[in-house]
């Protein structure tokens, strides 16, 4: 039996969390945290990567110091605009489907942006890319948490989040390795230089993750909350099989206790605008909101200073 598989009740009718715990803890959970970690690494690459691209692309794109400043904010503005939309879509359409869609479109647009002939084309494409990379940045933690039993959930989310910290080292190291190359491929509308190649490389984590997620199951908790009981149990039995090496038919839970999450169905009735308004009631969480702003500034602010420097 897989390591971490705790001794639990084998009753066929259980609450969702008990049913999730009965899947054990092993190979699948390690795959899930590696996947989400790599996906979050892709998000960091796409957002912070511009910090290292702007100083070397300013000649090709004829950027002024002012252009460098507003251009650096593009991915963050796009993420802020669409993060709640992706949450709403994930609650109504499914985590897996929305993650796959956003990563496919985001990576394609990012690669296309490397061929931008001028600043404004590059800005529009990077903004569009930011709209879609917001999906994984908003949903990755939820998806990871819903694929792991409650006894290990906090630990797995913490491990997944470590990739964000690693990303702040990965991005400059990759830039240091690629940008010193001296090549200039003359295409009919652009000169293809190392910074354009770096843009494509930063998109690779999403390309890889978009393929990998097709092999992973939809969140059993989402399916459960939607009332799709048999699909949820099927995914739980798959996780159980990967973790334990047993046949999925040996999964000890055959049905759930009758309890459903009402917040998702209520959210569909409310609509995205009302749900956004509820999230923006800052006065209800003023202290937490202020603390969050300081933390975000600490994480991102220290990487922005190089934006106005020239290569």
What spans do the regions from the language model cover?
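Short intracellular "coupling" helices and adjacent cytoplasmic loop segments at the cytosolic face
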Residues: 239-256
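Transmembrane-helix signature of 12-pass secondary carriers
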Residues: 2-226, 230-237, 257-311
């Amino acid at each position: 039996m897989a390591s971490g598989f705790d001794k639990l009740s084998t009753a066929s009718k259980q609450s969702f969390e008990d049913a999730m715990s009965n899947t054990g803890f092993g190979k699948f959970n390690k795959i899930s945290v590696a996947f989400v970690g790599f996906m979050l690494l892709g998000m960091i690459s796409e957002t912070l990567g511009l910090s290292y691209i702007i100083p070397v692309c300013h000649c090709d794109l004829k950027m002024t110091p002012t252009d460098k400043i507003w251009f650096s904010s593009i991915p963050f503005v796009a993420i802020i605009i669409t993060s709640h939309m992706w949450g709403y879509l994930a609650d109504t359409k499914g985590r897996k489907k929305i993650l796959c869609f956003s990563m496919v479109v985001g990576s394609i647009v990012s690669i296309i942006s490397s061929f931008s002939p001028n600043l404004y084309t590059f800005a529009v494409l990077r903004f569009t890319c930011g709209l879609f990379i917001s999906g994984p940045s908003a949903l990755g933690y939820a998806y990871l948490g819903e694929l792991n039993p409650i006894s290990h959930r906090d630990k797995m989310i913490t491990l997944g989040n470590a990739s964000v910290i690693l990303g702040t080292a990965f991005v400059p190291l990759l830039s240091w390795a690629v940008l010193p190359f001296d090549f200039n491929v003359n295409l009919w509308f652009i000169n293809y230089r190392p910074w354009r190649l770096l843009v494509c490389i930063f998109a690779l984590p999403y390309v890889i993750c978009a393929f990998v997620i097709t092999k992973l199951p939809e969140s059993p908790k989402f399916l459960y909350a939607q009332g799709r009981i048999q699909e949820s149990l099927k995914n739980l039995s798959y996780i159980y099989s990967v973790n334990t090496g047993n046949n999925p038919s040996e999964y000890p839970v055959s049905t759930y206790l009758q309890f459903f999450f009402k917040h998702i169905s209520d959210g569909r009735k409310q609509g995205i605008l009302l749900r956004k308004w509820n999230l923006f009631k800052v006065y209800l969480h003023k202290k937490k909101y202020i603390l969050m702003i300081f933390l975000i500034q600490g994480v991102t602010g220290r990487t922005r200073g190089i934006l106005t420097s020239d290569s």
